[in-house]
Amino acid sequence: MGTVRSQIRPGLYAITDNRLTPADTLIVSVEAALAGGARLVQYRDKGSTASERLVQARNLNSLCQGFDVPLLINDDPELAARVGAAGVHLGQDDCSLVDARRLLGEHAIIGITCHHSLNLAQTAVDGGADYLAFGRFYDSATKPGAPPASPDVLTEAKALGLPITAIGGITGNNAEPLIRAGADLVAVVGGLFGGQPSDIEARAKAFNRQFARHHPLFSLSE
């Protein structure tokens, strides 16, 4: 798939949630998101057992590989290594970037949560992160206690030279200002998977149409 950076393409970043994408609908839901053009997928499950997560992550990785889309694992470099996922996403209280890089290697994608802080972002850049995630920008059921962020941080973070992800309460109705402010990806949980499974593909396409209008490097043909 080329260099690490080339794997991170502008567009929709689909994030699973075991409450919205339980085991019996996980694969069909993510497949619909991929069919709709998701450019990155993160497996996030805070409720299943380790053995269940292993099976689900393996199945998701096979699915994502079929679409040539990277799968990242939330907060668990060891699971990412076991299933051969493309990388991990780490929060500020999770495994260190250094330890994750040591385990997964130089070709893994490692994203870092930076909340609303350019200082945290600079630390992540210095540590070798591959993308930076800022948010929450809107009220979020997934992380209701997360500190709010202003779209201005997306614009300012562009100077750091890494792909920028916006997260937190994003829907098809409020994503546009974040893309205009500089988001290369919008990470979406409930705004993608919170409705009927039959609507997921259309929701994904709607996000990417906004990128087609407002992101200079986005192409619907990719």
Swiss-Prot record:
InterPro entries cross-referenced by the UniProt entry: Aldolase_TIM (IPR013785), ThiamineP_synth_sf (IPR036206), ThiamineP_synth_TenI (IPR022998), TMP_synthase (IPR034291)
Q: Name one GO biological process term.
A: thiamine diphosphate biosynthetic process
Q: Which UniProt keywords apply?
A: Magnesium, Metal-binding, Thiamine biosynthesis, Transferase
Instruction: Write out the catalysed reaction.
Output: 2-[(2R,5Z)-2-carboxy-4-methylthiazol-5(2H)-ylidene]ethyl phosphate + 4-amino-2-methyl-5-(diphosphooxymethyl)pyrimidine + 2 H(+) = thiamine phosphate + CO2 + diphosphate; 2-(2-carboxy-4-methylthiazol-5-yl)ethyl phosphate + 4-amino-2-methyl-5-(diphosphooxymethyl)pyrimidine + 2 H(+) = thiamine phosphate + CO2 + diphosphate; 4-methyl-5-(2-phosphooxyethyl)-thiazole + 4-amino-2-methyl-5-(diphosphooxymethyl)pyrimidine + H(+) = thiamine phosphate + diphosphate
Q: How is the cofactor bound?
A: Binds 1 Mg(2+) ion per subunit.
Pathway in which this enzyme or protein is active: Cofactor biosynthesis; thiamine diphosphate biosynthesis; thiamine phosphate from 4-amino-2-methyl-5-diphosphomethylpyrimidine and 4-methyl-5-(2-phosphoethyl)-thiazole: step 1/1
Transferase listed as a keyword: yes
Looking at the keywords, is Lipoprotein present? Answer: no
GO CC terms: cytoplasm
Q: What is its EC number?
A: 2.5.1.3
Q: Where does 2-[(2R,5Z)-2-carboxy-4-methylthiazol-5(2H)-ylidene]ethyl phosphate bind?
A: S140, A141, T142, G169
Binding annotation for 4-amino-2-methyl-5-(diphosphooxymethyl)pyrimidine? Q42, Y43, R44, D45, K46, N74, T113, K143
The molecular function terms of the Gene Ontology recorded here are: magnesium ion binding; thiamine-phosphate diphosphorylase activity
What cofactor is this protein dependent on? Mg(2+)
- Pfam families associated with the record: TMP-TENI (PF02581)
Q: Which residues bind Mg(2+)?
A: D75, D94
Q: Which protein family is named in the record?
A: Belongs to the thiamine-phosphate synthase family.
Spell out the PANTHER family in the cross-references: THIAMINE-PHOSPHATE PYROPHOSPHORYLASE, THIAMINE-PHOSPHATE SYNTHASE
Q: What is this protein called?
A: Thiamine-phosphate synthase
Lineage, top ranks: Bacteria, Pseudomonadati, Pseudomonadota, Gammaproteobacteria, Pseudomonadales
